[in-house]
A protein has these predicted regions:
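Hydrophobic alpha-helical segments at protein termini of multi-pass membrane proteins
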Residues: 1-191
Length: 191
């Protein structure tokens, strides 16, 4: 008697699926982040302004934002390691664009200080995606959180131009790590 063989076709995301994941970064990750912030910031009432900023932006923000960006990646079916990784870049890019526009147009932050984040968010999200694709999400999530913490900590504690230099350094580490991890992904289905 022959054993039954199951063949699973590799799934490559088409343009509409890629757009879906980009929009997830815009319409799911950003609102989820803002919703969680609403509750975490209320826990800090009574502290001085710098301490609130440090705890909120350097500690809470990395955990919240990295989770919010990775969240849509758990909605996938029959994806390969490589496609999960690539979809993560799109989620991070969607998140990064909305964050850039918010900081520049609403908060009046000079665009030069926000441009590194446009590279950081896709890179950090893809680092987490590598962990998801290889069934080890926690260490890669925590590494992305550490990078995010470092970037935000430098932004809060360093003075200009060192803020920008610190950000460029952290972004370079994130982008390099993302690139190295992408070379390790395979067209192997993730079940």
């Amino acid at each position: 008697m022959k054993k039954a063989e199951v063949v699973i076709q590799l799934h490559k995301p088409d343009a509409s699926e890629m757009l879906f994941f980009f929009l997830c970064g815009v319409i799911i990750s950003v609102p989820l982040t803002l919703f969680i912030y609403q509750y975490t910031d209320s826990l800090l009432i009574g502290l001085d302004a710098f301490t609130i900023a440090l705890i909120s932006r350097a500690f809470f923000a990395p955990f919240i934002e990295e989770f919010s960006k990775a969240y849509p990646l758990f909605y996938r079916h029959g994806e390969t390691q490589r496609s999960i990784f690539d979809l993560a870049v799109l989620v991070g890019l969607g998140f990064g664009i909305v964050e850039l526009l918010t900081y520049v147009s609403v908060l009046g932050t000079p665009i030069i200080y926000r441009l590194p984040a446009l590279l950081f968010h896709p890179a950090s999200t893809s680092i987490i995606a590598y962990g998801i694709a290889t069934k080890r999400p926690l260490p890669f999530y925590l590494f992305a959180v550490l990078l995010h913490f470092s970037n935000n900590y430098f932004a809060l504690t360093l003075t200009s131009p060192f803020q920008l230099l610190g950000s460029i350094f952290v972004v370079a580490v994130a982008v390099f790590t993302s690139w190295r991890l992408r070379t390790r992904t395979k067209e192997k289905i993730v079940i």
